[in-house]
Amino acid sequence: MLSKALNINGETGLLAVIGDPVSHSLSPKMHNLALRHCQLNYCYVALPVKPHNLVRAVQGFAAMGMRGFNATIPHKENLLPLMHTLSEEASHIGAVNTVVIDDDGKMTGHNTDAYGFITGLKEAWRSDLSGLTAIMLGSGGAARAILYGLIQAKAARVIIANRTIERAQALIEAMQPYAPNTQLMVAPTQADQLPLESCDLLINTTSMGLKGETIPYIDLARLPHHAFVSDIVYGAHPTPLLRATAQHQLGGQDGLPMLIHQGAKAFELWTGHSMPVELVEHTLRQ
């Protein structure tokens, strides 16, 4: 049985997640559970950091000897120029969500979001994602990481459906150099413009569903029976999209596995230990 109390002392290391806002984050619960399980003397906290304070905050983290931190909205892109080194994923995606600080205060920026999405998807659906056709709704920061992950997994075709065609096109232009074998396309958010019949994987990267709203231009009845639906929104109850997915007897998952697996990768980068993923997911879903 894990103790619920953190044993903080003079040698306790500090880890954190920064954002604005950040009080809703599940990361402290996830990481502190894993730290206790692995008997590691760290504490993970959520720190609200306004955009105009980002540079000072990051400099302070290095000065005080923090081991590292996560970043969420709105800081992922703005961390790029503050890093001493970037991982290949962070450089290609154009965003940092995990920072490792060495003993000299040097910071390496990583992006574990693509890994988190692909790992969760493989566990829930199928281990080989090569050759698939995916339709992705949205072109924001999460979409950028997920698209990179699909390219690395050798998807054959990814269609980005977005209300603003120009934003989707800009995302494709940014990712095209890394996608020699993946066809990237743009489609408007109109039912008759989406080739759902040939879709293997439907991904919602937008916030639609967070407040219980449906996605009007998606007719799940048009998907083939083998298709899988991934909605990166997560909460106490399934989104309307995932409820409809179950009604159509399709496979699907919410965004919690992505959150957990990106966190597990960050945890390993900081500590060298593996996160107890099953324990964490069971706890977060209670």
Curated annotation (Swiss-Prot):
Catalytic activity annotation: shikimate + NADP(+) = 3-dehydroshikimate + NADPH + H(+)
Binding-site list for NADP(+): E88, G138, S139, G140, G141, A142, N162, R163, T164, I165, E166, R167, I232, G255
Keyword match Amino-acid biosynthesis: yes
CDD domains, sorted: NAD_bind_Shikimate_DH (cd01065)
Keyword field: Amino-acid biosynthesis, Aromatic amino acid biosynthesis, NADP, Oxidoreductase
EC id: 1.1.1.25
UniProt name for this protein: Shikimate dehydrogenase (NADP(+))
Naturally occurring in which organism (per UniProt): Magnetococcus marinus (strain ATCC BAA-1437 / JCM 17883 / MC-1)
